[in-house]
Curated annotation (Swiss-Prot):
Belongs to the novirhabdovirus nucleocapsid protein family. This is Nucleoprotein. Encapsidates the genome, protecting it from nucleases. If expressed without protein P it binds non-specifically RNA and therefore can bind it's own mRNA. Interaction with protein P abolishes any non-specific RNA binding, and prevents phosphorylation. The soluble N-P complex encapsidates specifically the genomic RNA, with protein N protecting the genome like a pearl necklace. The encapsidated genomic RNA is termed the nucleocapsid (NC) and serves as template for viral transcription and replication. Protein N binds protein P in the NC through a different interaction, and can be phosphorylated. One of its GO terms (molecular function) is RNA binding. Its main location: virion. The gene is N. It holds the Pfam family Rhabdo_ncap_2. Residues 345-392 are annotated as: Disordered. It is found in: Virion; Host cytoplasm.
Length: 392
């Protein structure tokens, strides 16, 4: 643990150049985006049919049709313009034909949304649907359902697209969308290409930012903010807090985030900034390098620390997936860290001692903590990898 201080201090020297991890190059020229192309003119009836089948057995084909439609908007010249825009951002672009042969008598899980489509609103609503589907790259089914039920209405209404609240929140439907929109898939790259195109257009940028661009920040940005706030609240040196959290991997995450922020800060052109952020999201190393389970656990601890100074902070834990036993343990670790530092950075027990004390306190109060079990059920119960012997 002693080396953690040296490693964290080394973040000051992180530059915009490449690190040892090839997945952190953030270079648009290494990313192949996909655009679906078609010579057909899509009627309202065809688009309604495709929308209704998103989340059903023909999800991939339906999303392909919708991607081709919003890319061209029934004008082949629009597809050429979209390709040029992305190439100018230094991405490689593959234009692939779309398979628009939808079968008959199929399930229609999003028929309610399809019913409200008109000639006037179908482009905007299809974009909104695709932007929402893009969140499945980062959200699991339970978190996506929570998003649709609690946040989508506010965002959709703010953009004049209140019809988006008709998107099905069935777990089975969302699971099929999630299976289609996975990292590295052509559909995923096509949707992210559409996001970029809309971010670059002043007429659509605000809507794209509101409905989907928040995912460009990624979990790392949130982690850095939580960590900084907890460090300030405790009056604890960052290196000491890292040691107490027993999370060496957070240093690697911090290095990647610091590097990304340095690169983005050095670029003046907004188009180039978005290209760098998107290359991070689509790079092969992104989903391999992030310890999502550990991030969830450390987020749980940090929020419990900040709750001691700003009541209501732990309300953000509703979407954080950790096991109920770990929630209890995180509360005790946070309490002991507050006691250790007492706002002035004073010395106290080491990391292993803190964890042992927290485990003991958590066991002693086991009968008083049914509320943690209830919270765990609300956000999906045990988190990924949340076995009892893997609390930390």
């Amino acid at each position: 643990m002693a080396n953690l201080k040296e490693e964290f201090a080394g973040l000051r020297g992180v530059k915009g150049g490449a690190l040892e991890d090839s997945g952190t190059e953030y270079d648009p020229t290494k990313i192949n985006l996909t655009l679906y192309g078609t010579d057909k003119l899509y009627t309202l009836a065809i688009i309604k049919r495709a929308v209704s089948q998103v989340g059903g057995s023909q999800t991939n084909k339906a999303l392909g049709i919708l991607c081709a439609f919003v890319t061209s908007e029934n004008n082949p010249d629009m597809t050429d313009a979209a390709v040029k825009l992305l190439v100018d951002m230094r991405f490689k672009v593959d234009v692939v034909p779309v398979d628009d042969r939808l079968g008959d008598n199929l399930d229609d899980p999003n028929s309610k949304l399809a019913e409200v489509l008109t000639e006037e609103n179908m482009v905007d609503l299809v974009k909104g649907l695709l932007f929402t589907c893009a969140l499945m790259v980062k959200y699991d089914v339970d978190k996506m359902a929570t998003y649709c039920q609690q946040k989508l209405e506010r965002l959709a209404n703010s953009q004049g697209l209140n019809e988006l609240t008709l998107i099905s929140t069935s777990r089975a439907v969302l699971a099929r969308i999630g299976a289609a929109v996975r990292p590295g898939q052509k559909l995923t790259k096509a949707i992210y290409g559409i996001i970029l195109i809309n971010l670059m257009d002043p007429a659509t940028a605000a809507r794209a930012k509101a409905l989907c661009a928040m995912r460009l920040s990624g979990t790392g940005m949130t982690m850095v903010g939580l960590f900084n706030q907890a460090s300030k609240n405790l009056g604890a040196p960052p290196a000491d807090l890292l040691e107490d959290l027993c999370m060496k991997s957070i240093i690697d995450s911090a290095r990647r985030i610091v590097k990304l922020m340095r690169i983005v800060a050095d670029v003046e052109d907004m188009t180039a900034k978005y290209a760098i952020m998107m290359s991070r999201m689509l790079g092969d190393g992104y989903f391999k390098s992030y310890g999502i389970n550990e991030n969830s656990r450390i987020t749980c601890i940090l929020m419990n620390i900040n709750e001691q100074y700003d009541e209501g902070t732990t309300g953000g834990l509703a979407g954080v997936r950790v096991s109920p036993p770990f929630r209890k343990l995180a509360t005790e670790i946070a309490r002991l860290l507050v006691k250790k530092y007492d706002g002035n950075g004073s010395a106290g027990p080491g990391a292993s001692d803190l964890v042992r004390q927290a485990e003991q306190a958590a066991q002693e109060t086991e009968g008083e903590d049914d509320k943690y079990d209830e919270e765990g059920e609300e956000d999906g119960g045990e988190g990924e990898g949340g076995e009892d012997e893997e609390y930390y």
